[in-house]
């Protein structure tokens, strides 16, 4: 019998019974906050995913001598989170500063560096890997405020969590981008204990305080919609076609392959397709995942680099000819971003891109980023020589 882990003691009710009903005319608002950072608002439910607003500078990273493709293995010094910037974003997206959950896709610095800050500023519950919870503890978040999830449906440890407001979350164990040439980044790695307090757990290297957390976690959302069909979307912040069909392993334990876990979560949700897929990766990766989830809309994320200052706005336009061609051939609508804090609205009709002008104005962003023809040309030239990867844009 497949396990739906009981998380009642940690303040989460696993949805063995039907979820509470959402208000009529329900819709999902999904705001892109750069990289793989999202703010989801579903009725009264408010969720941040990843929420990496601090920018740890590239200059402090040292690559592995043995694996030079592992460019972010070590650092020369700890780096403090930018609490003021996180607070600024919080105040712009939420009028009362309230947040219910912080989801962590995986535990690398460009995803979880600010998770503890979000939790401390808002009281939100963290959901993620054991590494994410240890990272948060090192920064002062009580262990009781963080829920460790597996997402291993094929071993009977796939979580189905009732978030309230008619929203059910299914956790899906996934892999991380890369391959055997950058094993520290790619293969599953977990912290064994909270990072040492002497540096606050703030050594950003993937072989230091921020390993990937045993691969990554994708999140499959379903939203009750009284009087209409159920809404659904799947979001993943990293993936690799290299071993998508092979089991994710960490510390000698197997968690099943990403594709098998995703297929099992889809069956558990009673879904044959999703309204939207928030994703990262190439046409090759999409060709493996699309047959499992059959998305109506593809929304890219983690394509804009992670060392650029967020406050300058989108650094370059989205461009992936091969992915665009694949999606078009399969009738999947591609809706790329035009600026940070673009807002997508999902409802019974589909997905629409909303201006979100009030939030952008609070943060100093234009409605849509303007790019010179030379920038477009440079992006296309670069695209022709380098395959897309969420850690090597």
Each model region followed by its residue ranges:
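Active-site-proximal loop/helix segments of hydrolase catalytic cores
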Residues: 202-293
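Active-site environment of divalent metal-dependent phosphoester hydrolases
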Residues: 36, 56, 108-112, 133-136, ...
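Zn-dependent metallo-beta-lactamase
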Residues: 16-84, 170-178, 184-212, 391-393
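Bacterial N-terminal signal peptides
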Residues: 6-15
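Active-site neighborhood of phospho(di)ester-bond hydrolases with catalytic His/Asp-centered motifs
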Residues: 49-52, 98-108, 127-130, 232-238, ...
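Pre-active-site segment of Zn-dependent metallo-hydrolases
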Residues: 45-103, 108, 113, 117, ...
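Metallo-beta-lactamase
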Residues: 23-25, 131-218, 222-227
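Binuclear metal-ion centers of metallo-dependent hydrolases, dominated by the metallo-beta-lactamase
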Residues: 133, 137-163, 291-393
């Amino acid at each position: 019998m497949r396990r739906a882990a009981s998380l009642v003691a940690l303040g989460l009710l696993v949805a063995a019974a039907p979820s509470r009903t959402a208000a009529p005319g329900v819709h999902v608002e999904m705001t892109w906050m750069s990289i793989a950072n999202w703010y989801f608002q579903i009725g009264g439910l408010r969720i941040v995913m990843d929420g990496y607003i601090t920018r740890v500078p590239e200059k402090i990273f040292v690559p592995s001598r043995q694996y030079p493709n592992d460019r972010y293995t070590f650092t020369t010094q700890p780096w403090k989170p930018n609490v003021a910037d996180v607070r600024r974003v919080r105040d712009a997206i939420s009028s009362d500063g309230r947040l219910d959950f912080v989801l962590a896709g995986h535990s690398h610095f460009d995803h979880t560096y600010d998770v503890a800050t979000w939790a401390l500023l808002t009281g939100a519950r963290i959901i993620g890997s054991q590494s994410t919870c240890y990272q948060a503890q090192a920064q002062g978040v009580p262990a009781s405020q963080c829920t460790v999830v597996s997402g291993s449906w094929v071993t009977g440890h796939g979580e189905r969590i009732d978030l309230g407001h008619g929203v059910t979350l299914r956790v899906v164990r996934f892999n991380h981008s890369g391959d055997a040439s950058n094993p520290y980044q790619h293969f599953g790695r977990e912290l064994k204990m909270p990072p040492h307090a002497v540096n606050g757990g703030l050594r950003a290297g993937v072989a230091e305080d921020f390993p990937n957390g045993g691969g990554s976690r994708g999140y499959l959302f379903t939203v009750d919609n009284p009087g209409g069909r159920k809404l659904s979307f799947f979001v993943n912040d990293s993936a690799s076609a290299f071993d998508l069909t092979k089991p994710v392993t960490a510390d000698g334990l197997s968690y099943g392959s990403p594709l098998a876990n995703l297929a099992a979560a889809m069956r558990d949700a009673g879904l044959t397709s999703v309204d939207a897929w928030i994703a990262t990766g190439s046409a090759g990766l999409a060709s493996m995942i699309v047959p499992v989830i059959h998305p109506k809309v593809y929304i890219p994320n983690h394509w804009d680099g992670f060392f650029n200052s967020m406050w300058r706005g989108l650094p370059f336009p989205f461009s992936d000819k091969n992915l665009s061609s694949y999606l078009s051939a399969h009738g999947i609508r591609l809706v790329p971003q035009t600026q940070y804090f673009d807002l997508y609205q999902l409802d019974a009709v589909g997905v629409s891109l909303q201006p979100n002008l009030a939030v952008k104005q609070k943060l100093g962003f234009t409605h849509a980023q303007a790019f010179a023809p030379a920038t477009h040309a440079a992006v296309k030239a670069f695209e022709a020589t380098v395959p897309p990867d969420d850690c090597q844009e």
